[in-house]
Amino acid sequence: MSLMPFAPSRPLSIGVELELQLLGCNDYNLAPSAPEILRRVAKRTHPGEIKPEMTRSMIEINTSVQQEYAGLVTELRALRDVVSEAGCFLNVAVAGGGTHPFQHWSEQKIFDAPRFHYLSELYGYLAKQFTIFGQHVHIGCPGPDEALHLTHMLSRYIPHFIALSASSPFVQGHDTGFASARLNSVFSFPLSGRAPFVLRWNDFEKFFAKMTGTGVVESMKDFYWDIRPKPEFGTIEVRVCDTPLTVEIAASIACYIQAMSRYIMVEQRMAPEEDDYLVYTFNRFQACRFGLEGVFIDPRTHQQRSIREDIMEMLEHISDHARELHAVEAMERIREILIVGNGTSWQRRAYASEHNLADVMQLQAELWMGN
């Protein structure tokens, strides 16, 4: 199977996908209610898309193509409200967060769709363990070579995106010590990690042809890379974020990535180098384990600082670009996260107060649904 042509798209356009938790209101455990929710929302007019995910306790919302923060957050709120209203009718709550804190993977049910059944057969129990919840951000690119350039230049900042969105400290009733435990599950898949260091689209087409020739992959969907080109949309897709606890934070992180992309395209003159990946796995681990307090090593200068400090410096670099993109409000929310903490900090504070993970999930659902 050949690689799809890289579709035209408006540079720096944005789109967001969010995977959401469905919770029974009696115990705030995951509830296999996606089929019923989807039947109800199908009767409603709404923007974007509302889709099933791997297991029946999940649902995905996708925005349409947007240009700036105001339109993006407005559409995310509308999608949130449609799903939340359908859930309320069914006594099901909806929540953000990267993991459910006390569900057990063995209890999950695969959603009845051919691709999900295929993945379940292929990956076995990993498919049910993939009941985790992430945010994907699409950035429009002017062409395929530019998409590969942006893929590699943004890879340096993967720890920023992980640390800002981190909201998955609890797994199966325990605090893992990680800010984002969700990404440990993603790393279990054989085609996860970073994209190969290829800078020209014709070379990427050759790589893809070799991979399909082995029978290992059939399409770009089979690559679970942290950032991957999405040729059918004309975008790159950043895939490392936990689903944040509110749509406002989700939109703000997306616009942080958008403003950074504009900075890279317009102002930054560095070319990507393969040695940029020397500390990639270390920096990624630091973000997953310690969040904003993690150590960040600059791959070129070898300077060490906290991820929080690196984000603060980046906010200065991209301030003019954020202003051009009408994303000043989004950047203010990013600064607020640096001060008050990410979703993991909120969840741990809630657990310290409530001493019960079901109560934490009730509060988390109320926060997501805007109650």
Swiss-Prot record:
A GO MF term: ATP binding
Domain of life: Bacteria
Family matches, as Pfam families: GCS2
Catalyses which reaction(s): L-cysteine + L-glutamate + ATP = gamma-L-glutamyl-L-cysteine + ADP + phosphate + H(+)
Keyword Nucleotide-binding: yes
EC number: 6.3.2.2
SUPFAM superfamilies named in the record: Glutamine synthetase/guanido kinase
Biological process, per Gene Ontology: modified amino acid biosynthetic process
Keyword tags: ATP-binding, Ligase, Nucleotide-binding
Enzyme category, top tier: ligase
Role of this protein: ATP-dependent carboxylate-amine ligase which exhibits weak glutamate--cysteine ligase activity.
Family (UniProt): Belongs to the glutamate--cysteine ligase type 2 family. YbdK subfamily.
NCBIfam families, per database record: gshA_cyan_rel (TIGR02050), PRK13516.1 (NF010040)
The name this protein goes by in its record: Putative glutamate--cysteine ligase 2
